[in-house]
């Protein structure tokens, strides 16, 4: 089965089945500058959630919107915020923070800020937006806040720090509070932060809650911050055909590497691919595995600096590399085992309150019917084959390495919760990865919710997409629950038809490479990557803020392998290919530069040196090149002797009298002139 698809369309911001064709932005009474910006962004008609929420929010209503990813929730609150800021500026020039947008992750801070900049494109001088999700210190961010922005985008934790330090004042000027991805905000443990923020808000403040699911926690949050809200539910007809094709394939742990290599090598997977793994170690293990086979890729995880993470997402979206390995650690925040059961119970409850104004929208969230159950403990996977791999690493320091490896073995089964990763990192949900053709769950998600969020990174807008999940025996029970949930929601998670015996010829290469990727190799790769990204991060802070075009000079898909990667691994001999592919397969994968030269990232310095030496060696064997004689030149014996004499005189710097008439030189001995003199001289017998 071939996973490839043709997808040349530009990604729309909202799925076509969620567009309200009966409504226009012009009919909402929006500022002309906003309308021009929306047109520039390609917005023709509002989405269903936008057509209902924007008029209500402009009337001052609190909004609780439940809608799936890709339904246009961000524009549903950004448009009325900018409209109200412009209206306030016409009445008064008093500076003050007019709106605060809270998001769960630092990655979303940058994305939401960029969206605000797009909507306010023609009025940027009047509407200032600051995001506090970067890695600047509180003191550095004070400079950004000194001019008092109109809109602040932040994570709850960082906003609390500024409120407690009194660098942000909200009591007298704040008009709107938005909590985007409200269910995820609570999952990340921000409940206490929300309570603190609430104490700094004015008594009268319009609030938005945007969420993909309505859990009990969201209901409690609704009571805390909303007053007589309009509740918008996106109800989707199950019969609607999805653009997403979902597949799963059961395999052993080691076979995941065999499968991913074979699918890429045989061109069964092509295009822009997003790989999800469950922890940082697996992230670098998969990257090192790809590098051994000269496959370019980049990694995205919580240990990288936030500026580098932003830039990696930007470069991936621009198509500078096609393979991105992302660590999804969101399951760590799902500590409450009742969470998914509560979600199911809540979906069946009547959300109508006596004080609530209900507005039903025509589509239903594909996550509405999730009967998700937490399954963290039974689905944790052991790290594979580390014991065998360690024996291959750096034999010269055996004693020292054995001690380190023993420590690694003791700690290898521990969760990585205590890593130095950013607690506000998250990419499986909300992040706009553009034009992703295939999502590969290299490590199967820990929960049903995580599965749904991951596969939502593809098939966005009107585009088609494919989700492929590798399932080991640890995950088979969870796979059954995922399949049931997706089936109940009107989707079909199908088994992937693939004959493993057809790729057995690749097994020895894959397993040989895996033996070289032990714990030490992974640790070294992490150190190398972190050092490089820290360097990139410093550059990003200063120069690249003023020269965004120079971002192309930074590469996040460079190789982490210090040693020369065997060149024979970049090609696969024809005898290893399955019969049906021998006449079609391209013999080469995309090649990683083994050692970039300064000033030219795409050239391999070492390979050039090797080629030069080979050329010199061939030249020495070719008498015509040695004597500087062109090919197809006719020479007499005497002329050849003269040419050889000139060559000897030039190369050996000997006197003409020491050369015989036939062009050969007389027998000579090499003799040192003295013990302290390294010069040699020729003595003629």
UniProtKB/Swiss-Prot annotation:
UniProt-listed Pfam families: DEAD, Helicase_C
Domain Helicase ATP-binding: 54-232
Primary localisation category: nucleus
Motif (Q motif): 23-51
Reactions performed catalytically: ATP + H2O = ADP + phosphate + H(+)
A Gene Ontology cellular-component term: nucleolus
Class of this enzyme: hydrolase
Region described as Disordered: spans on this chain: 332-423, 593-617
Function recorded in the entry: May play a role in later stages of the processing of the pre-ribosomal particles leading to mature 60S ribosomal subunits.
Name of the molecule in the record: Probable ATP-dependent RNA helicase ddx56
């Amino acid at each position: 089965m071939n996973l490839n698809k043709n997808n040349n369309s530009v990604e729309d911001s909202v799925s076509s089945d969620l567009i309200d064709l009966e409504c226009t932005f012009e009919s909402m009474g929006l500022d002309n500058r906003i309308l021009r910006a929306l047109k520039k962004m390609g917005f023709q008609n509002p989405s269903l959630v936008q057509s209902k929420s924007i008029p209500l929010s402009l009337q001052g209503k609190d909004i609780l919107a439940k809608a799936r990813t890709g339904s246009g929730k961000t524009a549903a609150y950004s448009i009325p915020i900018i409209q109200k800021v412009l209206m306030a500026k016409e009445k008064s020039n008093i500076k003050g923070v007019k709106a605060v947008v809270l998001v769960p992750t630092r990655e979303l801070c940058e994305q939401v800020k960029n969206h605000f900049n797009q909507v306010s494109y023609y009025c940027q001088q009047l509407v200032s937006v600051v995001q506090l999700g970067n890695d600047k210190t509180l003191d550095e961010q004070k400079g950004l806040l000194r001019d008092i922005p109109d809109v602040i985008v932040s994570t709850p934790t960082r906003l609390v720090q500024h409120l407690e330090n009194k660098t942000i004042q909200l009591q007298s000027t704040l008009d709107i509070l938005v909590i985007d991805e409200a269910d995820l905000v609570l999952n990340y443990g921000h409940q206490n932060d929300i309570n603190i923020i609430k104490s700094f808000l004015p008594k009268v403040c319009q609030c938005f809650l945007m969420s993909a699911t309505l859990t009990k926690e969201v209901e409690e949050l609704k009571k805390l911050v909303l007053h007589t809200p309009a509740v918008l539910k996106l109800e989707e007809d199950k019969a609607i055909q999805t653009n997403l094709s979902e597949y799963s394939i059961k395999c052993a742990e080691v076979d995941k590497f065999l499968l991913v290599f074979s699918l890429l090598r045989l061109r069964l997977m092509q295009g822009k691919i997003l790989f999800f793994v469950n922890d940082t170690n697996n992230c670098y293990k998969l990257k090192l595995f790809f590098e051994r086979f000269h496959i370019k890729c980049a990694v995205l995880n919580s240990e990288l600096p936030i500026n580098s993470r932003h830039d990696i997402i930007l470069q991936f979206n621009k198509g500078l590399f096609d393979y991105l390995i992302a660590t999804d650690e969101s399951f760590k925040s799902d500590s409450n085992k009742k969470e998914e059961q509560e979600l199911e119970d809540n979906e069946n409850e009547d959300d109508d309150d006596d004080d609530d104004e209900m507005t039903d929208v025509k589509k239903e969230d594909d996550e509405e019917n999730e009967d998700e159950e937490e399954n963290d403990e039974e689905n944790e996977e052991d790290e594979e084959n580390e014991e065998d791999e360690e024996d291959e690493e750096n034999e010269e320091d055996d004693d020292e390495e054995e001690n380190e490896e023993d420590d690694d073995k003791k700690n290898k089964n521990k969760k990585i919760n205590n890593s130095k990763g950013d607690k506000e990192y998250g990419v499986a949900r909300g992040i706009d990865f553009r034009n992703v053709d295939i999502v590969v769950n290299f490590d199967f998600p820990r929960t049903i919710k995580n599965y749904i969020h991951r596969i939502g990174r593809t098939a966005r807008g009107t585009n088609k997409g494919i989700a492929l999940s590798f399932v080991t025996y640890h995950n088979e029970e969870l796979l059954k629950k995922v399949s049931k949930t997706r089936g109940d929601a009107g989707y079909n998670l199908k088994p992937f038809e693939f004959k493993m015996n057809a790729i057995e010829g690749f097994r020895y290469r894959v397993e040989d490479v895996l033996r070289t990727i032990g714990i030490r190799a992974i640790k070294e790769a992490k150190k190398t990557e972190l050092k490089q990204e820290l360097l990139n991060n410093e550059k990003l802070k200063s120069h690249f803020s003023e020269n965004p075009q120079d971002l192309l000079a930074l590469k996040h898909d460079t190789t982490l392998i210090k040693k020369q990667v065997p060149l024979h691994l970049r090609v696969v001999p024809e005898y290893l290919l399955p019969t049906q592919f021998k006449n079609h397969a391209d013999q080469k994968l995309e090649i990683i530069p083994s050692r970039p030269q300064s000033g030219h990232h795409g050239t391999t310095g070492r390979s050039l040196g090797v080629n030069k030496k080979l050329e010199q060696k061939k030249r020495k064997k070719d008498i015509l090149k040695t004597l500087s004689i062109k090919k197809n030149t006719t020479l007499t014996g005497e002329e050849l002797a003269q040419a050889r004499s000139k060559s000897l005189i030039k190369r050996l710097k000997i006197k003409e009298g020491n050369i015989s008439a036939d062009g050969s030189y007389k027998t000579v001995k090499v003799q040192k002139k003295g013990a302290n003199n390294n010069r040699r001289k020729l003595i003629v017998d």
